[in-house]
Regions:
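A short, glycine/Asx- and small/polar-enriched loop/turn
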Residues: 137, 227-232
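Conserved beta-strand signature within the Rossmann-like core of class I S-adenosyl-L-methionine
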Residues: 180-184
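S-adenosyl-L-methionine-dependent DNA methyltransferase catalytic core
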Residues: 1-30, 37-100, 205-208, 232-307
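Core alpha/beta nucleotide-donor-binding catalytic domains of modification enzymes
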Residues: 55-178, 188-192, 197-200, 207
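A cross-domain feature marking catalytic cores of carbohydrate-active enzymes
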Residues: 145, 186, 217, 252
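Short secondary-structure junctions
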Residues: 34-36, 213-214
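Acidic pyrophosphate-coordinating catalytic loop
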Residues: 131, 224-228
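Conserved S-adenosyl-L-methionine
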Residues: 123-124, 188, 211-223
Length: 307
């Protein structure tokens, strides 16, 4: 029965396949893909779109088989640019023991210490951290070096931007620690920044460190049980002495798209509804900018002088 099919709104479908909301709307109106309406919202049934690679992957997912790996032993890790701990939490849930987390921002460090008092949080500038005591003691190093220098939503200064040079601090940490594997994430704009020369520099640096880079991949959060339209470039590198002995496989996507309702109310993500909260008030300047974004829009809808 058609009512048992998975419904996805036009906007979420656009995020899933990496196109604009306007394009998804045109597909629905032109009949490029069969559209339907549920509760006043127009969208599509995933089962009718299985020819699309992203949809096929979701409908034939091995998510449940891959979600509960059993570690062969206790694995150690180091987290750089830890922020509030999102990536670190994921690594912890995957079975890694954090030996060290480094973060510059005091508020973020306070958050880490409050939520995970057992973690060894080193607050301060990564440029002042000596990683040599951890040499050959760490299995995995990870970090999302600051992305403003490469972001589509930023001025794209790249390595000319002070923040862009922090990649080389991550590279120094890898050189001093010599982890078996390291991972870094950034915005997908990094791939095309400066006509690809920035990313070529990163790839060459990884090779000089003695690591083999797995073919980088842009992962969409919306495909991995996260109710968020966020895309991130994931880079994983394996130390050369191990690279021929292991095979890395990107994870299968979740079987359906999660929405804001899943984030706010009891669902497959959370056991309870989100508690009642006053929320956070934006500064007046930021609130004014956000008011210029139409429903379903993003930074690309802002006037050029603001975006």
């Amino acid at each position: 029965m058609i009512c048992n099919m998975q419904f996805i709104s036009e906007n979420n479908f656009a995020a899933l396949v990496g196109t604009s909301n306007a394009t998804a709307q045109k597909w629905a109106e032109s009949g490029t893909y069969p559209s339907h309406t549920e509760n006043g919202v127009r969208g599509f049934y995933l089962e009718e779109l299985e020819a699309i690679p992203e949809v096929h992957a979701m409908l034939n997912s091995k998510w449940n088989e891959e979600c509960n790996p059993v570690p062969l032993r206790a694995f150690t890790s180091v987290e750089l640019f830890a922020g509030g701990g999102g990536l670190a939490l994921g690594m912890s849930l995957a079975g890694f023991h954090h030996v060290l987390l480094n973060e510059f921002d005091k508020a973020a460090c306070d958050t880490l210490r409050l939520n995970r008092p057992q973690w060894n949080v080193l607050e301060g500038d990564i440029r002042n951290v000596d990683f040599t005591p951890l040499c050959n003691r760490i299995d995995f190093l990870s970090g999302g070096f600051p992305c403003q220098a490469f972001s589509y939503a930023g001025k794209q200064g790249g390595f000319n931007d002070t923040r862009g040079t922090l990649f080389f601090e991550l590279a120094r940490a890898v050189s001093e620690i010599k982890p078996k594997v390291f991972m870094c994430e950034n915005v997908k704009g990094l791939l095309s920044h400066d006509n690809g020369r920035t990313f070529d520099t990163i790839k060459n640096t990884i090779a000089e460190l003695g690591y083999t880079l797995v073919e980088p991949c842009v992962l969409k959060a919306i495909m991995y049980q996260v109710p968020q339209k966020r895309e991130r470039l994931i880079m994983i590198a394996i130390r050369n002495d191990l690279a021929t002995k292991v095979r890395f496989v990107w994870p299968s996507p979740f079987s359906r798209v999660m929405t804001l309702r899943d984030a706010f109310y009891k669902s497959e993500i959370f056991d309870t509804d989100v508690p009642v909260s006053e929320g956070v008030k934006y500064p007046s300047k930021k609130e004014k900018v956000l008011s210029l974004v139409p429903q379903g829009g993003d930074w690309r809808n802002l006037p050029e002088e603001i975006a």
